[in-house]
Amino acid sequence: MKTRNLIFLVALISQIAYSQKVDVYQRPIQVERSRDFDAIHYKITLNVDLDKKLLMGENQVTMTPLNDRLSKCVLDAEYLVVNSIMNRDGKKLSFEQKDNQVFIELNHSYNHTDTIQFTVKYTLDKPNLGLRFIDESPTNPRLVSSDCFPNKARQWIPCYDYPNDKVTTEMIVRVDEKYKVLSNGRLVGVTDNRQLITDNRQPATKTWHWCQELPHSTYLINLSIGDYEVIADSLGSLPVNYWVYHWNADDARSSFSKTPHMISFFSKLYGYDYPWAKYDQVITPYMGGGAEATTATLLGEGVVMDKKAEQDFSWERVIAHEIAHQWWGDLITLQSWEHTWLNESFGTYSDYLYTRNEYGEDAGAYDLLGKKNQYLNEAHNRYIRPIVFTRYNDPGDNFDSHTYPKGANVLHLLRYILGDDTFFRTLSTFLHQNEFKPVDTHDLMKTVKEVSGKNMDWFFDQYVFSPGHAVLEVTKSWDGASKTLKVNVIQKQDSLPGVPIYTIPVNLGFSFADKKIVKEVWLKNKMESFEFVFDSEPLLIRFDEGNYLLKEVTFRKTLKELVYQAENDDMIGRLSAVDELKSFSGDPSAIEEWSKRAASDSFWAVRQAALVNLAKYSGKNYLDLIKGTARDENSKVRQSAIRILGDQKSPSLLKLFKEVYEADNSYVVQAEALRSIGKCGGKKQLAFLKIAEGRKSYRNVVGKAAIEAISMIR
């Protein structure tokens, strides 16, 4: 599951002590749920009336006792009303429904070799959580949409609703014939029920039969009903379908077009072919991002957009993230909710891996930097906790920036330590050994040791079972007489809440006029000193060459070093140098370097950061350069340039803003141009802006910007 998060730019966070504004340690300790039986199969039969928002259902439960002398069992059942329970012989079983559960007397004592089967009949009237009846609106048709995460399957299916049990499922759904039905697994068939009609006033119905023949957890069950248009795609013989609204079907094919490629990419990357019968994606209005379900992912309706919007609003990473869950979360599933990272950290790291593969090393590095900064924002402004954390009120409490982006960065460091080949062989082995099973972190640790031959318990103790991250202060000194460079590192993280002194490898990069030398050292103590002998003093020392550590670091550099770094380092180093040059904002060399980076750096985020600093610290001397960046190839840079120019509030720029509005191929840039017109234009511009208000755009960003601009003038 993923929500769409903002990517934060590089920021030096000065505080070392952590601000625990949310005391997560006051939450209750949770333990894995115990069970008396192994659920084998749920055959769910539903009669769904969308007009009345009524569901009449039955679940035929097949189970096996885990121990002998099982004479009663408990299923979860919240909101729904159980009407009767009958065994396979048609005999009624006694039951009591209370405390969101149904307690069933089996009328017989069963042993662990027995198979038990009974059918629960129930009614659900006007639900709104686990299963939503969604009214028709200007933006969506009438729909039914499930939301089983994390423990809401029980709100429309009586079942054992905890992820440590996996079960095969059938979904047999009778609905008005005008609707289509999607669920997990293979479509067995669709039956026309016209021959069953005895009263002409009865609506014609169809029965859709889906079968999920490989086991999965109940929170991964999906039921989606509506007048969808289904766009058929494929990856070889694998059916791939997109369930969308009729009015956005033309855009949907483009929005989802990379799905088969993503499935192929992850199959090869993880050394495990896509494990299921098909892959569907279905849009729903209440979803802010995406929610995985076995073979049938739910996505917010914002995922569908026209080609013009994709450069600024693309959901490509969200789509990739949810596809990755078909392995990480669906094929293998967390055994209990404290191990959420086995789903979400792996899903988040997967969307980084896809981004890097698809758009290059710099785009991947920037994505991973954004993930790191999301975590740091939470660590400094909310709380720190271990990634594996047993304290929560609700399982959803742990689906945060520790589980998603921090865990992704931890996996990146583990990959560096193990090496690419060993890391990916470990993941492939882990998937094959644990396919269709619930797992916990110790299962992963066992596989790491088995494949790599390395005991990595120390790594998991520091990064998964302990809170926090390394906060480092780095200094250096050069002795010209002995040609010795000394690098000092102090770990300054607050250890009071259980943050360790880290044992971590780090690469030190030493740049010279004709070469770069990289040396790996290990930090093991609070204070470390490392000495190196070189023929000359390095032009630049890069701490954490390759950007593998989850860290905050202070390493002061001279103006000369920062200028060299801005021109010669990798993208992350250049971006950092552009930021750190603010310490020398009054120096012409800093202004000149920002000008160079804004005009010609190879990566858009460096150009954008340099542009922002140039505008802030150089006055109006560089307006012509900023005008030039308003034609940058990247829409984010163009948007920043137009915003900066708009802040000048100069009527002389009106012509430029109107040209940009009329010609730019980005809704976001067009919107910024309108706001800039509002900043510098008078009432003569109102007619122009009123026309712009009616221009169609994704999420109405252009129309909203026109309204903002009009309010500025009035």
Give the role of each language-model region:
Residues 121-194, 199, 203-227, 388:
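Extended, low-hydrophobicity, Ser/Thr/Pro/Gly-biased non-transmembrane segments
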